[in-house]
């Protein structure tokens, strides 16, 4: 691609920690623009749920639905059970460079923990 990409996996829309993660990111999108990176949020929610959530919370990053869970499984970030829902995405962050190589990968210990966004920004700064 022409840009570095930050891929953020999150378990479910309309949950508190996910909202904090992506709203913080939406507010900080200018920082990622300066680092020449596109930010994409991925969850196993339907695109309709994601759209409703994005509008309600004014989330300005690209959201991608992984309803069939193939991307979540390909990145090996499956969380077995959350709020009665099986096989959601774990909370995770990846930085993928312009050549498609993963330069940073982090899966948080629990869905309540946020990824280390400073580490993500540090990796992006080196990739300029």
What positions do the PLM features span?
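Chalcogenol-based redox active-site neighborhoods
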Residues: 1-128
